[in-house]
Amino acid sequence: MINLIDSPGHIDFSYEVSTASRLCDGAVVLVDAVEGVCSQTVTVLRQTWIEKLKPLLVINKMDRLITELKMSPGEAYTHLSKLLEQVNAVMGSFYQGERMEDDLRWREKMEERLNAAAEKTDSRSSSILENGDSIDTTNTPAEYEEKDDEDIYFAPEKNNVIFGSAIDGWAFTVRQFAGLYEKKLGIKRSILEKVLWGDFYLDPKTKRVLSSKHLKGRHLKPMFVQLVLDNIWAVYEATTGGNNGKGCVDFLPLRDLSACIIAIYLYFPLQRSCFG
């Protein structure tokens, strides 16, 4: 059983977000695919950082990229990449701020230890030197240990990013599409999860995954565009018209215009993607 606590997104109710976060083990952070990172997004992310919650990023309203902004799948991929960079920049600022505070505390602590050691050395130096002994200076303070920041960032290949449309009831992760294409492409799911997002391309002839440096001048679509976004765009173009403004009304009855979008929902229901 999963208990969900819905908190208001308006900045005037940030205290309610703060209260709710203290009752939770994790947080589902929604970001509008069109509007991107706003002040309230930063506030919510900061609260999850302070409370040490495990955040899950949901890029919502993906349908608006198609129906309102009229983006192509390639343009949408570039837009989503920049949005993800903005969110991770916020997380990185939290990490850097905490690191600077930890570094300052460590330096203060080391300074206290050195001062205490110096006082002890001064009190015993005269007797040690009279006996002809040397002073041990090998006991130096340990160096500051850097914390690994790899786990604080959002990345689709880590399965902590969900793309979806709440109004149409669908959402998906890279892991789900990797499961769909595993048998068709003959590539292990664990490998597909790592290459479905980023600068990776599928060779249509050899069915091999290529990095950008092995393209050799060929203009291939990123795998996320080719295997994921192209399919979703095709569904919306067949029903709502997508970025063309015309749906395929000629061969789809009016009552079935949303049938394909329902099919996306059946494959990738929002609740399963978030909590499955």
Please describe what each predicted stretch is:
Residues 1-276:
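Structural and coupling elements of P-loop NTPases
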